[in-house]
Amino acid sequence: MFNVGWFYDGEEIVKDKIPFNFKKHPLQRTPPEILGLEYKEVKPKLVISRKKTNIRDKYVVIAPHASSHAKYWMHPKGWQTIIDYLNEKGYKVVMITGEPLGDEWHDSKLGGTLTGVINKTGYNIDLSDRMIDIRDAELFIGVGSGLSWLSWSIGTPTILISGFSYPYTEFKDCERIFTLDYKACTGCFNRKWLDPGDWEWCPDHKDTPRHFECTKTIKPDQVLLAVNKLLNIY
C-alpha cells in the first residue's frame, strides 16, 4: 500500500515517504514520484449535470477569494478594472466564491465591494451548481484556489493570478499571470513553510510597505491581455 501526499515534520520533508522536494516541482508531480510512474499533467474526469446555467447571455466567472491571504490578487483596483472592462465588452461577470459579496471584511481584501457582478457567492451553493456555472462560462479568472483547479479540470479557459507560488506550481494549461517586476519578492510558497495560522503571512516583508508585493505589482493590463487573447477581443 502506498501513502500519497506531502509529508513533512515541521520544516523538514520526511524523505522516506516522499523522495523529492515537492515545493520545487508541480504539485501534480507528487503522486507519480511516490508511485514510481512517469509524470505528466492529467486532468481528472468529472461528471457534470447536463442542466444548463440559469445565466442568460455570455459571461465570465471570477473567483477572487482563497484560503490564504497570500494567494489574493492585492492590486487595489485590479478586480474592479477587469469587471468594468468585461461589462463594457458585453460580458456579464459572475462571482462564485464561498466568501460572501457585501461582507465588509471579505470585500476589503478585494479593494472594496465589487460592483457590476452577478452575485453567486455564499457557502450554501452546491459544488455541482458551481461546476455548471464554470462549464458554461466563456472564461474563468481566479487565484491559486480550488476553484481555479476545478475550472482547469472542467476544461474552461482559465486565467490564474498568483505571485505567492511560482508559475510551475499549478498547471500548464492556463494563462498564468505573474508579476513583471523583476525586483518584486515572489514564490514564498516554494521557498518557505506556510504558517496557516497567520492570515497576514508574508515571510519576507510582513508589516512593511512591501507586504504582498508579489501580487500588488501584477497590473490589470497583464490580466486584460490574457482576457483579450482567450475571448478573441481585438
For each of these PLM feature ranges, what is it?
Residues 1-234:
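Catalytic machinery of carbohydrate-active enzymes
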